Amino acid sequence: HIFTEFGSFTVGESGATLFSIINQKQQNDRESWYMIDSSFMTTLPDIWGINQRYILLAINNWDKEYQRVFLGGLTCDSEDYYNGESHSNAIFLPKLNGGPQYIGFFHTGAYQESLGGFGGIQHCLIPAPKHIIIDREKGDNEYYTRLFAKEQSYRSMMRILGY
């Protein structure tokens, strides 16, 4: 009998996390920050915990002009950011043009959900994100999605806290 654990090195490409850019902040004359709609500390804890590198891509607006950016999360914690300098030389994403901008971290593996927890109370009360399963039938080129779990509601978080 062979026992194994399906982690980053065997099924790492099975995980992806998508974020929406909710705002842009000009820190100084050189630093343009894109703020995501979640927290790196709760959604992808290995980013700040062990400086894990992931494939980062823009999901849309590939035909737009790009600029160097820094990525920050929603919390007030000084560690809630994606350090482009330790993960790659620089991060370049499409310039914001008033429409939505989505980004994806790919090959996140099996551990981020276990480390961040699902359905419990997250750092700074950031709700657990919606989870979807993307699949396709063998021999079919179409992808199908189904909802695995809705985004965590404030009611469920308050219930866990005893309110």
Segments (PLM) and residue ranges:
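Charged (often Lys/Glu-rich) extended helix/loop segments that serve as interaction or gating elements
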Residues: 1-163
